[in-house]
């Protein structure tokens, strides 16, 4: 008689548990769909640094006074008030009205600045997804990717990309996805910091980028940042679903009941 009651209780608990799991699986994934609403890259401040260089009011892959492969007050790769990697009131990789990259604040203070508090949730996410990059304000470096095959609209640009793609990044810098309200903000920030960091690192070695290089690099990095967002969103959703599953009352009750049976 006792065994039949125990079996009935176990059956009821399992039904309640799987009902709760079914509800968890119906929860929508964070972030929303791609290409939904508004411009692709809202005009918001980027925590990683300056926005993309001024390009005459065009969006990604849009003309700046001309289509792809057409002059913009000059031919491809020619300077517009100065070549890429050279100062424009503080150019790529050079100070903009202050200290260099990774520097800031006042120096010579009597007291040391207080250390920022560590968010353990972000640390756990970093351990699962990638290493936190020192000196870049909590950005993580993603795993290496194959550079995407992109067509730029002209034979010259396609050939130029195939011949120079090795000079462009194959990894991106990013912050945890839970720090962004949507995928557009994530990709915008990811492209900003990745292009800037790669340009700074390369120009310090004596190699400059042309305007053609920068535009192609932005397109390449954009695709990799989208891929990185999809990976991180999926991992974040799975971690959240696991936490919800094991913290649900039916599961806790079932575990407690099984422990009671084993101990008793």
Curated annotation (Swiss-Prot):
Cu(2+) 4 binds at residues 96, 98-99. It is found in: Cell membrane; Golgi apparatus. Transmembrane segments: none annotated. Disulfide bonds join 190-225. Keywords: Amyloid, Cell membrane, Copper, Disulfide bond, Glycoprotein, Golgi apparatus, GPI-anchor, Lipoprotein, Membrane, Metal-binding, Prion, Repeat, Signal, Zinc. The keyword Disulfide bond applies. InterPro entries: Prion, Prion/Doppel_b-ribbon_dom_sf, Prion/Doppel_prot_b-ribbon_dom, Prion_copper_b_octapeptide, Prion_N. Glycans are attached at residues 192, 208. GO terms for biological process: protein homooligomerization. Cu(2+) 3 binds at residues 88-90. Its main location: membrane. Residues 1-24 form the signal peptide. Cu(2+) 1 binds at residues 72-74. Residues 242-264 form a propeptide. Residues 55-107 have a biased composition (Gly residues). It is a lipid-anchor; GPI-anchor. A lipid is attached at residue 241 (GPI-anchor amidated alanine). GO terms for molecular function: copper ion binding. Cu(2+) 2 binds at residues 80-82. Monomer and homodimer. Has a tendency to aggregate into amyloid fibrils containing a cross-beta spine, formed by a steric zipper of superposed beta-strands. Soluble oligomers may represent an intermediate stage on the path to fibril formation. Copper binding may promote oligomerization. Interacts with GRB2, APP, ERI3/PRNPIP and SYN1. Mislocalized cytosolically exposed PrP interacts with MGRN1; this interaction alters MGRN1 subcellular location and causes lysosomal enlargement. Interacts with KIAA1191. Belongs to the prion family. Its primary physiological function is unclear. Has cytoprotective activity against internal or environmental stresses. May play a role in neuronal development and synaptic plasticity. May be required for neuronal myelin sheath maintenance. May play a role in iron uptake and iron homeostasis. Soluble oligomers are toxic to cultured neuroblastoma cells and induce apoptosis (in vitro). Association with GPC1 (via its heparan sulfate chains) targets PRNP to lipid rafts. Also provides Cu(2+) or Zn(2+) for the ascorbate-mediated GPC1 deaminase degradation of its heparan sulfate side chains. It is linked to Variations in PRNP are responsible of transmissible bovine spongiform encephalopathies (BSE), a class of neurodegenerative diseases that affect various mammals. These diseases are caused by abnormally folded prion proteins. BSE can be subdivided into at least three groups: classical, H-type and L-type, with the latter 2 collectively referred to as atypical BSE. Susceptibility or resistance to a BSE disease can be influenced by at least 3 factors related to the host prion protein: protein expression levels, number of octapeptide repeats, and specific polymorphisms. This is Major prion protein 1.
């Amino acid at each position: 008689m006792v065994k039949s009651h125990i079996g009935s209780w176990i059956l009821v608990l399992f039904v309640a548990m799987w009902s709760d799991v079914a509800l968890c699986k119906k929860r929508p994934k964070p972030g929303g769909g791609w290409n939904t609403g508004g411009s692709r890259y809202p005009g918001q401040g980027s925590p990683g640094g300056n926005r993309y260089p001024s390009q005459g009011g065009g969006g990604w892959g849009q003309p700046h006074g001309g289509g792809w492969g057409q002059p913009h007050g000059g031919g491809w790769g020619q300077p517009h008030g100065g070549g890429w990697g050279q100062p424009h009131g503080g150019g790529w990789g050079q100070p903009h009205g202050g200290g260099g990259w990774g520097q800031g604040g006042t120096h010579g203070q009597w007291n040391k600045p207080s250390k920022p508090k560590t968010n353990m949730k972000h640390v756990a996410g970093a351990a699962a997804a990638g290493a936190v990059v020192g000196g870049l304000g909590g950005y993580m470096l993603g795993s290496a990717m194959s550079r995407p095959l992109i067509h730029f609209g002209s034979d010259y640009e396609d050939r130029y990309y195939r011949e120079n793609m090795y000079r462009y990044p194959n990894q991106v810098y990013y912050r945890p996805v839970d720090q962004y309200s949507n995928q557009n903000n994530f990709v915008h920030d990811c492209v900003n910091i990745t292009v800037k960091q790669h340009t700074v690192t390369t120009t310090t070695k004596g190699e400059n980028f042309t305007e053609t290089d920068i535009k192609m690099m932005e397109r390449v990095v954009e695709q990799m940042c989208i891929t990185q967002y999809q990976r991180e969103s999926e991992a974040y959703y799975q971690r959240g679903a696991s936490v919800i599953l094991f913290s649900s009352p039916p599961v806790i009750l079932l575990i407690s009941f099984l422990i009671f049976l084993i101990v008793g």
